[in-house]
Amino acid sequence: MTITGQINSETLNNGVPIFAPPYRWSKHWPRFTDVNCITIRYRTDGSSIRQYIPDNLQIEETPIVTIMLLDFGFSVIGPYHELIHCVEVTYEGKKYNYSFLLILDNEEACIGGRELLGNPKVLGTIEFDRQNRPPTAFIHGRVLRPSNTVIADIHFKPLCLVLDAGESKTPITGLNLRLIPSLIPGAPPSVREYTNVDFTLQGGEVWEGVGSLNFPSNSEFEPLHKFPVLEYLSATYHRGAWVEQRLLNVYSF
């Protein structure tokens, strides 16, 4: 005699393990509050990074790179820190910020971002504590992976307040490669698509200033050093903002 399980297999639509999914599908895209963020934009050497870019994307000879260091104060998956590293590309005539590497310290955010949106997220150690600052104007954070190896140092020095609460809105139009290989040798991937995701910082204070980046590690596993700084373009610090993220489109190829 056998009995069947009680979970409806035709309506399963969450992550695994199914008895405690790390995220749940919802019609409401996640929001994050009490967010602090350093954003630095710079130009890099296209010939140095083209080896990391799919051939259906185009980049300039000196493409724009955006690096963001975030302190998410609160969300449905709790507080955490994250480094976002992306490069400007063109896909089918439109410009996007192609996600190269995201490092964070929250397991649920890592799993959900990878599986749902194709974000290239990995776990790491991020030191970006708003309460523990040196007695100077500098705001500093650093990223370690593995935990004893610094791969990125980020500095920001504020110069002026440019927008007050409620007026600021900074959208980042992202493009992620969502790729799930097939288990069958020689078969095409089970999933291969680009996801177009809007990531918007809103509200709070926006400070303009001077940014400085250093990538001290030469690791081939996290090759941030292959994105050298040729020219700094801008540096800002969002304080007490909130973030909204939503899917705009999916492009299969």
UniProtKB/Swiss-Prot annotation:
Pathway participation: Mycotoxin biosynthesis
Keyword Lyase: yes
Enzyme Commission no: 4.1.1.-
Keywords associated with the record: Decarboxylase, Lyase, Schiff base
Domain of life: Eukaryota
Phenotypic consequence of gene deletion: Leads to the loss of T-Toxin production, resulting in low virulence for maize.
Enzyme class of the recorded protein, top EC level: lyase
Active site, per annotation: K121 (schiff-base intermediate with acetoacetate)
Gene Ontology MF terms in the entry: carboxy-lyase activity
Lyase listed as a keyword: yes
Membership in a protein family: Belongs to the ADC family.
Function of the protein: Decarboxylase; part of the Tox1B locus, one of the 2 loci that mediate the biosynthesis of T-toxin, a family of linear polyketides 37 to 45 carbons in length, of which the major component is 41 carbons, and which leads to high virulence to maize. One of the PKSs (PKS1 or PKS2) could synthesize a precursor, used subsequently by the other PKS as starter unit, to add additional carbons.
Protein's UniProt name: Decarboxylase DEC1
Organism of origin: Cochliobolus heterostrophus (strain C4 / ATCC 48331 / race T)
Name of the gene encoding the protein in the UniProt record: DEC1
